[in-house]
């Protein structure tokens, strides 16, 4: 959600901090700030509500020059988005803190610190941290030791960075439930909540693990684990080009990422398909042994990843006969779970840092699940490190808040998982795996054909320019696709959108249908298409306007109030992946017509690292 950047160097670090914040804008935020230990030996800061550009304007009038500093983009959790609530927070102009996460016991700590004479100027939980650190420093005298002592009193999730005027030779940092990464330079070092913020200055990174404390100086880095032991963490070199953070020829990152889907799906498949079968060892050397034991599957995820899991349930049960449950992580983690025998626990997350999904995985380890598999896009993420097996999607960095290419690559990975389990247990019908492997090889081409309909979808989007409500319908494995389509539309166009199984139309949603409520549906040519046609007739009978993305063989014809976009033919199993594409394009073009911020929609964050 929020973003952290820190730097210590022999040069002016303010431009580095600002550029880092710009690279984190995709995560979503409502205010930004920077604090620098200036060349006169003072801690100075600048904070602004709104975009990083507003912060830049403030710095243009009053430049902050220094060799040590921290910066932050805030997404409000405690306290409104105001300048006073923006980070960094100060204590006595001597200590500055930036913080991602939520301190659950901030209220009793606040009252205690008030009793010690501290005056609070914000409504944030973060201000508790900076005053607590200042208090510890009075008796301890060393910033690193003070932080080690202070975190013992913090309950909740935090990734935080601290600088002090008393010790301007270091940044100290702590990670518990919110990611932090150190960037290594030559005679300079950096800190961020996401390596993307630092790629302009380094390609060498150290990822803090849960409970780690870090002391970052210009020419050294020291780490301590949760037990207080000196530790070394692996240095990871990043090789991917910086073009991922550049829109190139596209107007928005979202449109660029939609059009990248053929290539990222191709990359996700590379090295994972044999001549006629999925290569099970691509999940790891122990995968075959594990897959042989699976009798049940539990999938846990949030948002778009949850919709991917819902599609996987249809695949697992129809292709392998293995029962599968899918649950939202924020619900799973807080209920008493009855674990089925030999149950594989599967998590799905683009970032691998989604707070509820990580917490669910940690809970699962105590509940007796067979093993854990992560479907994730970030190799160095907490989810990957804490799971037994991983299948990495190869979507590359996804900048737009509304997920597109991450979703389709998750679906590909989940189908590979389904086929892998079915293969090992010999549960797949004769010829099915070879047929689906062949279709997977041709999938990037089919996705390209769907993207070629961009102009047609753009024309259809004009129907939504003055609409405020939309209904999405789907049957079978297309119902989660309808859910995803509704989510995309509401996320970026701010049109209220709901999705239902088409068979539920008469059980309530039909009451909403009129000429002002367009109904969007996807119609592959399968055994459910005739039933879907009946649902569409019910909509037209109530004056509802239909937008149908239909297989050429489905027999759905355009007419008054019925707008049909013909889709390339694809087998039923892979159709949820293909039919996602036009719904993404529709949402994008409607949002452009509405004039919304496509890449950074209001109130939303890319990576939800707090509850």
UniProtKB/Swiss-Prot annotation:
Kindly state which reaction or reactions the protein catalyses.
D-fructose 6-phosphate + L-glutamine = D-glucosamine 6-phosphate + L-glutamate
Q: Which GO BP terms sit in this record?
A: carbohydrate metabolic process; fructose 6-phosphate metabolic process; protein N-linked glycosylation; UDP-N-acetylglucosamine metabolic process
A Gene Ontology cellular-component term: cytosol
Indicate the residues that form the catalytic site.
2 (nucleophile), 606 (for fru-6p isomerization activity)
Domain SIS: from-to ranges: 287-427, 460-601
Q: What is its EC number?
A: 2.6.1.16
Report the principal subcellular site: cytoplasm
| Location of the Glutamine amidotransferase type-2 domain | 2-219
One example of the protein's molecular function in GO is: glutamine-fructose-6-phosphate transaminase (isomerizing) activity
What the entry lists under Pfam families is as follows: GATase_6, SIS
Return the InterPro entries for the record. GATase_2_dom, GFAT, GFAT_N, GlmS/AgaS_SIS, GlmS/FrlB_SIS, Ntn_hydrolases_N, SIS_dom, SIS_dom_sf
Q: Which Gene3D superfamilies match?
A: Glucose-6-phosphate isomerase like protein, domain 1 (3.40.50.10490), Glutamine Phosphoribosylpyrophosphate, subunit 1, domain 1 (3.60.20.10)
Group of enzyme by EC: transferase
- Protein keywords: Aminotransferase, Cytoplasm, Glutamine amidotransferase, Repeat, Transferase
Q: Which SUPFAM superfamilies match?
A: N-terminal nucleophile aminohydrolases (Ntn hydrolases), SIS domain
**Superkingdom assignment:** Bacteria
* The keyword Repeat is assigned to this record: yes
> Any idea where this protein resides?
Cytoplasm
Function, in words: Catalyzes the first step in hexosamine metabolism, converting fructose-6P into glucosamine-6P using glutamine as a nitrogen source.
**Assembly, per entry:** Homodimer.
Provide the protein name: Glutamine--fructose-6-phosphate aminotransferase [isomerizing]
